[in-house]
Amino acid sequence: MDATKWTQGFQEMINVKPMEQMISSTNNNTPQQQPTFIATNTRPNATASNGGSGGNTNNTATMETRKARPQEKVNCPRCNSTNTKFCYYNNYSLTQPRYFCKGCRRYWTEGGSLRNVPVGGSSRKNKRSSTPLASPSNPKLPDLNPPILFSSQIPNKSNKDLNLLSFPVMQDHHHHALELLRSNGVSSRGMNTFLPGQMMDSNSVLYSSLGFPTMPDYKQSNNNLSFSIDHHQGIGHNTINSNQRAQDNNDDMNGASRVLFPFSDMKELSSTTQEKSHGNNTYWNGMFSNTGGSSW
């Protein structure tokens, strides 16, 4: 260092200022230092005041965040609906919170299983067993109209079912009513107007379900007419076998009358016709003779 600087510094140290100058200098410096002192003093007061009410502000802030945060909707594990709620007063442990579904009305716990017991009571098994007894949906009534079985639908014709109606069953071997109009019934020449056939017994007459008599098989008779209609031969050419043909014709008439009127009252008419047929050949000879007219 230079000697001049050392001397100046030493002189400043030796030249001591008076007390008045020192006080004045301190008074001039105090207004500048007071704000810093106040600031330092007020900082602990502010922290103290904040520390006293800090717990309350933190609590209110957390409450506001809890209220502002919406409750999370938990899906129901049964019906997968979000219409659920958290059970505040029905929780047995906080580790497994309990929820309630308003849709299917079931409780379940988070991490647990779903309860099958609904709100208000009994299980579903008891309800299922009691509902068909209380209100049967499909009551079974007895069938008042039993079906009428035909001969083709009956598996065993020998067994008779008492539950069926009392109508007789049509036999398969009987012919249809239209088959009665055969060549025997109406001849091709239009002369024979009745239905010839064999004599029917009252025991052999079968009645259908409609009440009409059904006739057994008819045997074709070889003699459609008792005499020849062809004029190529003579009128009296077949007089030899006239009694036999008349007998066959009368039998056919009796059979036809028996078919048309199957009653016992018609036996008298058949007997009268038979008496006339057993006469001698004079009746037929007189009928077929050219002179005509003879005694009965």
Swiss-Prot record:
Compartments (UniProt record): Nucleus
Start-end of Dof-type zinc fingers: 74-128
Pfam families named among the record's database cross-references: Zn_ribbon_Dof
UniProt keyword terms in alphabetical order: DNA-binding, Germination, Metal-binding, Nucleus, Transcription, Transcription regulation, Zinc, Zinc-finger
Cellular component aspect of the GO annotation: nucleus
Miscellaneous information on this protein: The regulatory role of DOF3.7/DAG1 appears to be opposite to that of DOF2.5/DAG2. Both zinc finger proteins may act on a maternal switch that controls seed germination, possibly by regulating the same gene(s).
Described function: Transcription factor specifically involved in the maternal control of seed germination. Regulates transcription by binding to a 5'-AA[AG]G-3' consensus core sequence. May ensure the inactivity of a component that would be activated to trigger germination as a consequence of red light perception.
Descriptive protein name: Dof zinc finger protein DOF3.7
The species this protein was found in: Arabidopsis thaliana
